[in-house]
From Swiss-Prot:
Binding site for Fe cation 1: E56, E86, H89, E170
Gene (name only): coq7
Organism field: Cupriavidus pinatubonensis (strain JMP 134 / LMG 1197)
Cellular compartment(s): Cell membrane
Signal peptide: none
Reactions catalysed: a 5-methoxy-2-methyl-3-(all-trans-polyprenyl)benzene-1,4-diol + AH2 + O2 = a 3-demethylubiquinol + A + H2O
Entry's Gene Ontology cellular component terms: plasma membrane
The protein's name in its UniProt record: 3-demethoxyubiquinol 3-hydroxylase
Organism superkingdom: Bacteria
Length: 207
């Protein structure tokens, strides 16, 4: 029962945007950028950061589901550790959205539910498949973050600092999943994941 309550609390905090970072926000070492971005740039950056926030909501759901279905205690611990770092990402993105006078996606409950279902299915397929799913997810997120970094205005050092740290963490999570025995996913599954990601990013940018 304690585990259920804890996991349910984590889900509510992820959806509501009430998470707290266990690490310092990478943007805190930079000065505020009030007035440095044009209005159109602020809107675009807000859209990008909303997409990244949704990605972290989904990461919480995926890791939570895969943690609950893990057979091996070491795998469960690895999922929990990664989820805590992803929670940092969630808090950083939420803070940046507030700085930009914007908001998270209105569809966060839907994104969370869908990601949890996918993570549960991956976890039920076995630890090696589940770890392989983590590795592929983190690889695609790494590519996605690199694309967003290319789109950031030169004056937006705060968003850049956040996304660069997030990308470093995602690379490390993917490497750890492969090292723990994650198996490569079939090409059709990888393609399906990319397609689902495109739907999410397109909708979350606006809604």
């Amino acid at each position: 029962m304690d585990t259920f309550i804890r996991e349910f609390d984590m889900a509510l905090r992820a959806i509501a945007g009430a998470t707290r970072s266990g690490r310092a926000n990478p943007a805190d070492r930079l000065a505020p950028d009030d007035g440095q971005l044009e209005q159109a740039e602020r809107r675009h950056v807000a859209g990008l950061m909303r997409v990244n926030h949704v990605g972290e909501v989904c990461a919480q759901a995926l890791y939570q589901a895969q943690k609950l279905t893990a057979r091996n205690d070491d795998v469960r611990t690895q999922m929990d550790t990664a989820a805590r770092e992803e929670e940092d990402h969630l808090a950083w993105c939420a803070e940046r959205l507030r700085e930009l006078d914007s908001r998270p996606s209105l569809l966060n409950p839907l994104w969370y539910a869908g990601a949890f279902a996918i993570g549960f299915l991956a976890g039920r397929a076995g630890d090696k498949v589940s770890l392989g799913f983590v590795a592929e997810t983190e690889h695609q997120v790494e590519q996605h973050l690199s694309g967003h970094l290319d789109q950031l205005p030169a004056a937006d050092g705060r968003s850049r600092a956040i996304l660069e740290q997030m990308r470093d963490d995602e690379i490390r999570h993917g490497d750890a999943a492969r090292a723990a025995g994650g198996v490569p996913l079939p090409a059709p599954v990888r393609a399906l994941m990319r397609g689902a990601s495109r739907v999410m990013t397109t909708a979350a940018y606006r809604i």
